[in-house]
């Protein structure tokens, strides 16, 4: 049976009217009733579990009690140190097998693990490398010696350089460090948000020359869909800037060409894997751009959605909120679709900040004013009661990416993540992984673990997991009839999962 779409506003029995105030012992019956009523409000609190699901839920509860009483509790530790502990967890292993629905917040440059980029892509012919003045790297595929440019004066053929160095394993490991944030000493290497964001953005730039090479991009997208499916994910909405794709001879393709390639790869992957439901693109631009540039990007997104209505889901603005321009700064550009009488759905990053009361902190309200379809991260939403109320009434889901929020130093102990408030109130939520390759993850299982065990705590149950997974289809950009089809497909996978785990 497919879960029905939750109502925008849920009316609860006002039990407080019936609670007697007493100086003596409170009524145990009233206490039990209040506890049950509060539990019914949480994410998954309205989900009725079958007997088989109840059995699995009891097993999960016992496992969670054991993990919460252990000497080291993974959600309280930086993910880079907690990862080995998580991978030993029986809960995590079960979550890997669980059908998780859709990944709705992943950036295209971080879809595939860096080991594949280094061990596969950089070993391909005609791959050049340059070491920059700011201790980063650039890559370029070319059929001739690349010309020097302002940030790269000397390009070296990687094949030749590896031979000279004589330690390919050590060299490859050093290359991986340029493409990921993962480190054994995260607190030492990243003492504050500025430092970690600087490395974060450098890694994006470093990977670009590899990923945007046309033959690599085709393989990369197929590989990325495969990694998601391996983690029991059936649908993807990928944020992409549609960077210019290039050929070995320097030919550069436009965005239409890149979208068509994405379409071809997705079609082939679905043909090879019929139980994968599909993928769409959310076109994204960096908030460091000027108003005129964003205007042009919005117009381009409108045209691309017109040409590819089944593939282009909408538009977003990316980049660090704290140092970037606000949504309100771009109000003229973001109002263009309405002025032109067209619909361009927005999927705004908003509230990825702990700077309460600043102009950046108002992005949450502005995202809702611009009628965003979902809120990316929404870390600060719990501090905005009106925005929280509006998003709930409008069924605007928050894309919760717990590992990203921890690694980028918004929160250290995930038990203190403000999404705990949202989960306790049953706020519309989906779980996603933001930039998996940057954090040393793949798919959604790691983030589901952190949300289920850390943020949700002991009260989060199988009903919570079931609702979060189903939410990812409900709150996708798919049209209503495809949501119904997707939910039916997901429900069959869920039922098989329950049957396989009695």
Cite the ranges covered by each PLM segment:
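Sec-dependent signal peptide recognition
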Residues: 4-12
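Metal-cofactor-binding active-site regions of metalloenzymes
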Residues: 2-5, 17-502
């Amino acid at each position: 049976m497919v879960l029905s779409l939750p109502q925008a506003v849920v009316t609860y029995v006002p039990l407080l009217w019936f609670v007697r105030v007493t100086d003596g012992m409170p009524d145990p019956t009233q206490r039990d009733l209040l506890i049950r009523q509060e539990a019914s409000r949480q994410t998954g609190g309205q989900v009725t579990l079958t007997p088989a699901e109840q059995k699995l839920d009891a097993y999960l509860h016992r496992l969670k009690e054991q993990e919460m009483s252990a000497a080291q509790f993974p959600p309280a530790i930086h993910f880079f140190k907690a990862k080995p502990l998580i991978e030993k967890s029986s809960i995590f292993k079960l979550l890997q097998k669980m059908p998780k629905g859709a990944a709705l917040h992943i950036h295209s440059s971080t879809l595939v693990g860096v080991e594949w980029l280094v061990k596969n892509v950089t070993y391909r012919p005609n791959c050049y490398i340059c070491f920059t003045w700011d201790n980063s790297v650039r890559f370029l595929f070319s059929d001739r010696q690349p010309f020097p440019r302002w940030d790269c004066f000397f390009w070296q053929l990687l094949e030749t350089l590896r031979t000279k160095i004589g330690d390919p394993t050590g060299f490859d490991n050093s290359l991986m460090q340029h493409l990921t944030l993962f480190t054994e000493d995260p607190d030492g290497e990243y003492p504050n948000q500025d430092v970690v964001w600087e490395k974060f953005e450098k890694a994006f730039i470093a990977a670009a020359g590899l990923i945007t090479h046309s033959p690599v991009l085709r393989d990369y997208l197929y590989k990325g869909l495969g990694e998601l499916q391996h983690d029991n994910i059936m649908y993807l909405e990928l944020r992409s800037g549609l960077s210019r794709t290039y050929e070995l001879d320097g030919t550069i393709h436009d965005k239409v060409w890149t979208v068509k390639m994405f379409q071809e790869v997705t079609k082939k992957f679905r043909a090879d894997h019929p139980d994968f439901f599909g993928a769409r693109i959310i076109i994204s631009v960096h908030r460091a751009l000027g108003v005129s540039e964003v205007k042009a990007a919005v117009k381009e997104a409108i045209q691309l959605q017109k040409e590819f209505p089944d593939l282009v889901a909408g538009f977003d603005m990316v980049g660090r909120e704290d140092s970037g321009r606000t949504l309100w700064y771009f109000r003229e550009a973001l109002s263009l679709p309405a002025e032109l009488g067209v619909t361009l759905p927005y999927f705004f990053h908003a509230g990825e900040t702990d700077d309460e009361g600043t102009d950046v902190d108002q992005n949450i309200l502005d995202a809702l004013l611009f009628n965003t379809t979902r809120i990316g991260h929404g870390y600060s939403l719990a501090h905005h009661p009106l925005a929280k109320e509006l998003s709930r009434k409008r069924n605007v889901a928050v894309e919760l990416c717990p590992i990203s929020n921890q690694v980028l130093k918004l929160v250290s102990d995930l038990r203190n993540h403000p999404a705990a408030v949202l989960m306790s109130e049953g706020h519309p939520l989906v779980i996603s992984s933001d930039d998996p390759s940057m954090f040393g993850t793949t798919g959604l299982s790691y983030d589901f673990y952190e949300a289920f065990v850390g943020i949700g705590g002991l009260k989060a149950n199988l009903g919570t997991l079931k609702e979060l997974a189903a939410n990812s289809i409900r709150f996708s950009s798919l049209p209503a009839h495809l949501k119904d089809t997707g939910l039916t497909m997901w429900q069959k996978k869920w039922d098989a999962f329950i049957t396989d785990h009695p």
